[in-house]
């Protein structure tokens, strides 16, 4: 079982990054791929999920994010991909607060989360998020420098998170009107537009 990988980022993709450690490249699915830059030295905390069709590595900027991922993944009706999509769509401190306060309607705004699953999240995790909320363990990632194809990368990432092409196309004009920003910031803005509906 792996705890974390420390090495050089060699690929940044809308859904994953590749980190090279001792000459081996590990593909890691992460909720915030654009928080990393090609060539950066990084430490990624990982969770290894083994299924019949193979092994997948999920990676996070902090140990606390990894713990939250595992808690979400343990909820009935939530798999690792759904847990990752939820974490990509929201600041983790705000997510923990929503779970603690039982905001079911808030949780149903995430892709693939209906009322039943949102209620299950609250039922299973309420009372277990207090430390995250009280101690404010979750911190904002450092801003990423803007790159030319940032908007297109962000739109691809939104598609990878489960949003349809129609939904992505609907918010594209709104994102184009915004000042130029990093792909990660475009993703956050885009998710804000998508969740408002």
From Swiss-Prot:
Domain characteristics, as noted in the entry: Has three domains with a flexible linker between the domains II and III and assumes an 'L' shape. Domain III is highly mobile and contacts RuvB.
GO MF entries: ATP binding; four-way junction DNA binding; four-way junction helicase activity
Top-level lineage group: Bacteria
Protein name: Holliday junction branch migration complex subunit RuvA
Pfam family, one: RuvA_C
Quaternary structure note: Homotetramer. Forms an RuvA(8)-RuvB(12)-Holliday junction (HJ) complex. HJ DNA is sandwiched between 2 RuvA tetramers; dsDNA enters through RuvA and exits via RuvB. An RuvB hexamer assembles on each DNA strand where it exits the tetramer. Each RuvB hexamer is contacted by two RuvA subunits (via domain III) on 2 adjacent RuvB subunits; this complex drives branch migration. In the full resolvosome a probable DNA-RuvA(4)-RuvB(12)-RuvC(2) complex forms which resolves the HJ.
Source lineage: Bacteria, Bacillati, Bacillota, Bacilli, Lactobacillales
Organism: Lactobacillus delbrueckii subsp. bulgaricus (strain ATCC 11842 / DSM 20081 / BCRC 10696 / JCM 1002 / NBRC 13953 / NCIMB 11778 / NCTC 12712 / WDCM 00102 / Lb 14)
Principal place of residence: cytoplasm
TM region positions: none
InterPro entries linked: DNA_helicase_Holl-junc_RuvA_I (IPR013849), Hlx-hairpin-Hlx_DNA-bd_motif (IPR003583), NA-bd_OB-fold (IPR012340), RuvA (IPR000085), RuvA_2-like (IPR010994), RuvA_C (IPR011114), RuvA_C_sf (IPR036267)
One Gene Ontology cellular component annotation held by this UniProt entry: cytoplasm
Region (Domain I): 1-61
Keywords, alphabetical: Cytoplasm, DNA damage, DNA recombination, DNA repair, DNA-binding
